[in-house]
Amino acid sequence: MAASARGSGRAPTRRLLVLLLLPLLWAPAGVRAGPEEDLSHRNQEPPAPAQQLQPQPAAVQGLEPARAEKGFTPAAPVHTNREDAATQANLGFIHAFVAAISVIIVSELGDKTFFIAAIMAMRYNRLTVLAGAMLALALMTCLSVLFGYATTVIPRVYTYYVSTALFAIFGIRMLREGLKMSPDEGQEELEEVQAELKKKDEEFQRTKLLNGPDVETGTSTAIPQKKWLHFISPIFVQALTLTFLAEWGDRSQLTTIVLAAREDPYGVAVGGTVGHCLCTGLAVIGGRMIAQKISVRTVTIIGGIVFLAFAFSALFISPESGF
């Protein structure tokens, strides 16, 4: 009985101990679990934003054709107008340069200014003659370009087709003149220039004699001269004036004016000056030999063909193209 009473007294005591230990065992687990959950939420970083440069998966790439079918088109590359304007300006300059140099060459070979430079180079210093002639031709080219550029106040459509008509008229006229010329046409113009230069030389020699001392009295009967003639060679002045007067109103001047009205003025100025330099250089270096070898008739016919070619090109090049 005593043993049973002891066992029955221990049973409630054990139950009481178990009930007291259960909260102690559960509380640490719950307290530890709570902070771990909070810390896990705190340490969890927000998702990184998707980078647009990363390659898209196949599933996303498969949507591109569908977007294109629905009207979504990729953005076209943007082209600036500066590159197009620069390219057009370069083409306009090159076209004007080629047109001017070709027209001047076919117009000046065998022309009066060509023979003036050739004959004067045979008598005087070649460098002086070349300098005087080139200065006159450069001045004439610049003036012609300014005259042609002044017409740009008129709408380009009108000046373009008027200049085309003038090219056609010049071409037909040169062809008619070339076909009617005799084979000795160049020799006749050469003799005419020689006679004119001979007359100028006689006047120059007469002026020198008048400025010299008198044989009987020993005094000089000097004619008053301009001071700048003492610093500039008379040969240079003669080449300058003869070339300028011969070129004024010539076919090459009219051609330069027409070209400057429809082409790039800078290209026309540079091309015309280079063309005159080539022709005058050949005349000064070659002299009479080139003058005798050149067939003025052939050069005139070729020039007429070149002028007609420029007129014919207007059928394929619009005035708005810029060249």
From Swiss-Prot:
Membrane topology, Cytoplasmic segments: 110-126, 173-227, 288-298
Assigned GO CC terms: cis-Golgi network membrane; endosome membrane; Golgi apparatus; Golgi membrane; lysosomal membrane; trans-Golgi network membrane
Positions in the Lumenal compartment: 34-88, 148-151, 249-266, 320-323
InterPro entries, sorted: GDT1-like, GDT1-like_CS
Ranges of biased composition (kind: Low complexity): 50-59
Coiled coil regions in record: 184-211
Compartments, record wording: Golgi apparatus membrane
Start and end residues of each stretch annotated as Disordered: 35-60
Compositionally skewed regions (Basic and acidic residues) per UniProt: 35-44
Transmembrane segments: 89-109, 127-147, 152-172, 228-248, 267-287, 299-319
Key words of the record: Antiport, Coiled coil, Golgi apparatus, Membrane, Signal, Transmembrane, Transmembrane helix, Transport
Membrane-related topology note: Multi-pass membrane protein
Keyword Membrane recorded: yes
Signal peptide range: 1-33
Reaction(s) catalysed by this chain's protein: Ca(2+)(in) + n H(+)(out) = Ca(2+)(out) + n H(+)(in); Mn(2+)(in) + n H(+)(out) = Mn(2+)(out) + n H(+)(in)
GO molecular function annotation: antiporter activity; calcium ion transmembrane transporter activity; manganese ion transmembrane transporter activity
Biological process, per Gene Ontology: calcium ion transmembrane transport; calcium ion transport; Golgi calcium ion homeostasis; Golgi calcium ion transport; intracellular calcium ion homeostasis; manganese ion transmembrane transport; manganese ion transport; protein N-linked glycosylation
PROSITE patterns cross-referenced by the UniProt entry: UPF0016
Database matches in PANTHER family: TRANSMEMBRANE PROTEIN 165, TRANSMEMBRANE PROTEIN HTP-1 RELATED
Family of this protein: Belongs to the GDT1 family.
Function field: Putative divalent cation:proton antiporter that exchanges calcium or manganese ions for protons across the Golgi membrane. Mediates the reversible transport of calcium or manganese to the Golgi lumen driven by the proton gradient and possibly the membrane potential generated by V-ATPase. Provides calcium or manganese cofactors to resident Golgi enzymes and contributes to the maintenance of an acidic luminal Golgi pH required for proper functioning of the secretory pathway. Promotes Ca(2+) storage within the Golgi lumen of the mammary epithelial cells to be then secreted into milk.
Name of the protein in its database record: Putative divalent cation/proton antiporter TMEM165
Organism expressing this protein natively: Rattus norvegicus (Rat)
